[in-house]
Regions:
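Alpha-helix boundary/N-cap detector
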Residues: 35-38, 42, 61, 137-140, ...
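Charged/polar, solvent-exposed surface patches and flexible loops
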Residues: 42-49, 68, 72, 85, ...
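N-terminal, Lys/Arg-enriched amphipathic/low-complexity engagement segments
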Residues: 31-54
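N-terminal interaction modules that seed assembly of large macromolecular complexes
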Residues: 46-108, 112-115
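Intrinsically disordered, low-complexity RNA-associated tracts
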Residues: 10-11, 15-31
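Intrinsically disordered, low-complexity, charge-dense segments enriched in Lys/Arg
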Residues: 2-15, 112-184
Length: 184
C-alpha cells in the first residue's frame, strides 16, 4: 500500500513548494565544484618555445600568411590539421584579440613588424573584446568602446564614410556606437 504524502510537505510538482531545511547554497559544507583551467592546444606550447616573441607571454598580431610560413619552417614536425586548430584557438583568444585591438602592427616569425592591422580587423577586435568584457562587467563599457573606436578611426587615416563602410556590421547597437564615435 502507498502511504499518503505527509501534510507538512508540499508535492514536488507544486511551483510554490520549498524543501524543508536550509537550501543547498546555505549549507557551509557545500563547495562549488572548481572547473579546471582551459588547456591550450599542445602545439601552442611548442610555438611559444620556437617563437616566444609571438606566442609567449606577450602576444603580438600575426602577419597574414603565418600559417604557410609555419608549415614551410616546421612542416615535417607538425601536422597541418593541428596547426590550423592551434592557430584558430590562438587567434580567437581574448589575449590575442586584445593585442590586435591595441593597434600593434602585424609581426612575422622573426618578431619584426611587417604591416599594419587593417582598420576593419582592428574594429572587429575592439568590438569582440568589448563584448567579452561587457559580459563579465556590471558597469557599462560602451563609453570606453566609443573612445577606442574614435582613436582607431583617427589612426586609420580614412574619411568618415570610408571607415563607416569598412566597419559596418549586423549589430545595430555597435553600428550606432560607431556612428557616434565618428561624429565626435
Amino acid at each position: 500500500m502507498i502511504s499518503p504524502l505527509p501534510t507538512d510537505r508540499l508535492p514536488m510538482n507544486d511551483p510554490t513548494a520549498r524543501p524543508a531545511g536550509p537550501s543547498r547554497a546555505a549549507r557551509p559544507d557545500r563547495r562549488k565544484p572548481t572547473t579546471p583551467p582551459a588547456r591550450q592546444h599542445p602545439l601552442l606550447d611548442r610555438l611559444a618555445q620556437w617563437y616566444p616573441a609571438l606566442f609567449g607571454d606577450t602576444l603580438r598580431p600575426l602577419k597574414r600568411g603565418v600559417f604557410q610560413d609555419l608549415m614551410a619552417a616546421h612542416g615535417d614536425a607538425i601536422a597541418e590539421v593541428d596547426l590550423k586548430a592551434a592557430l584558430a584557438l590562438h587567434t580567437r583568444s581574448t589575449r590575442y584579440l586584445s593585442a590586435v585591438a591595441s593597434g600593434q602592427a602585424r609581426h612575422d616569425l622573426a618578431g619584426q613588424p611587417v604591416e599594419d592591422v587593417a582598420p576593419e580587423q582592428l574594429h572587429h577586435a575592439l568590438v569582440e573584446v568589448f563584448r567579452r568584457r561587457q559580459a563579465r562587467s556590471p558597469q557599462d563599457l560602451a563609453p570606453q568602446l566609443q573612445q577606442r573606436i574614435e582613436r582607431a578611426f583617427e589612426a586609420s587615416g580614412l574619411g568618415r564614410e570610408a571607415y563607416a563602410t569598412l566597419v559596418r556590421g549586423k549589430d545595430e547597437k555597435i553600428n550606432a556606437l560607431t556612428e557616434a564615435a565618428l561624429e565626435a
